[in-house]
Amino acid sequence: MTKDFKISVSAALISALFSSPYAFAEEPEDGNDGIPRLSAVQISPNVDPKLGVGLYPAKPILRQENPKLPPRGPQGPEKKRARLAEAIQPQVLGGLDARAKGIHSIAIGATAEAAKPAAVAVGAGSIATGVNSVAIGPLSKALGDSAVTYGASSTAQKDGVAIGARASASDTGVAVGFNSKVDAQNSVAIGHSSHVAADHGYSIAIGDLSKTDRENSVSIGHESLNRQLTHLAAGTKDNDAVNVAQLKKEMAETLENARKETLAQSNDVLDAAKKHSNSVARTTLETAEEHANKKSAEALVSAKVYADSNSSHTLKTANSYTDVTVSSSTKKAISESNQYTDHKFSQLDNRLDKLDKRVDKGLASSAALNSLFQPYGVGKVNFTAGVGGYRSSQALAIGSGYRVNESVALKAGVAYAGSSNVMYNASFNIEW
């Protein structure tokens, strides 16, 4: 059995599976190197008997550069015959008007066309126009080199892959699923009606109806269809995704660190406030006490000296003039002396009264400041007012506070007791 015959039989058997009413097989011919070459074989009621195979007796029909062949299209008395299948070099064809034009190409199905070397078109109306392109399915189209389609009405451009009915892939794109569509280069759409838009290059749409909305992205839904990524491991590198457990852990650590930092700062502020408050209070008290004691001592000494002096003088005068009748001028001198002494004691009393009033106003201001409230709600700011009194003095206080969290709060206030008597305070509260 010759090599030509083996090729003829193999091609004929394949073509028989897709038998059409009309077919042809080109005669073997020798090339310049003397090696026989068989272009194509197809089995149908009309077969070239030179190939040595046939299913039904029929007259030879040869085509391709044979002027004796009838023209393509309707011919003979029936006038309804379709065009014959046509092939060039080693190919297999089947179906009405199938064409395999490239070397080593295959066209199977009515009007199927394999136009370039090593192209494969399988299915009625399928087209493979690129080198090494494959179109499988009715009306499928592989329109560029190395393009691959599988499914009815699927389409792929150069280096693209479209799998599924009506799937469409652009250059270097991959579309998998019914009606999936990739309009951008170097992108992937997987799922029913998934879509990567033309200006969203290097993107991926995964899942039914998923659509991309930017380049260099991965979408698992669309604007009104959101999905969850499940069973996601914790990320280990900077550009890894983070799962919920990992996020909760990081948030807990961040909050704990913030709490410790806030507590430390609060303690520092509280210590400083306490030291300042104690220092101011101590200084104020010491100054007031020192001033009062000094003034009292000065007044007492002045009064005593004056009293002693005047008493001695009066006594001497009295002794000198005991036996003398007291004149009106002497009475006047004694009266003036008494008035002067009384005046000095009156001044001392006024000073002591003023000191008492200042102390009373200070205590009233302190009472008013202590009546101010601090906020109870976390994150809340309050404004509060209060009054206070001590003996005959009264004071008005206003203040504001802020609660940082359940454990920490801040408060400050100022009190006014009349004239220039102003007192203020600031406090920091920690609870546990």
Swiss-Prot record:
It is found in: Cell surface; Cell outer membrane. Residues 1-25 form the signal peptide. One of its GO terms (biological process) is protein transport. Residues 242-263 form a coiled coil. Residues 26-340 are annotated as: Surface exposed passenger domain. CDD domains: LbR_YadA-like. Changing residue 209 to H: In strain: YPIII. The chain crosses the membrane at residues 379-389, 393-404, 411-417, 421-432. One of its GO terms (molecular function) is collagen binding. Gene3D superfamilies: GSPII I/J protein-like, Serralysin-like metalloprotease, C-terminal. Pfam families: YadA_anchor, YadA_head, YadA_stalk. Induction: Induced at 37 degrees Celsius by the temperature-dependent transcriptional activator LcrF (VirF). It comes from the Bacteria. Residues 341-379 are annotated as: Outer membrane translocation of the passenger domain. One of its GO terms (cellular component) is cell outer membrane. SUPFAM superfamilies: Adhesin YadA, collagen-binding domain, Pili subunits. Homotrimer. NCBIfam families: YadA_autotrans. Belongs to the autotransporter-2 (AT-2) (TC 1.B.40) family. The signal peptide, cleaved at the inner membrane, guides the autotransporter protein to the periplasmic space. Then, insertion of the C-terminal translocator domain in the outer membrane forms a hydrophilic pore for the translocation of the passenger domain to the bacterial cell surface. Collagen-binding outer membrane protein forming a fibrillar matrix on the bacterial cell surface. Promotes attachment to eukaryotic cells and after invasion, is the major adhesin in infected tissue. Constitutes an alternative uptake pathway under conditions in which invasin synthesis is repressed. This is Adhesin YadA.
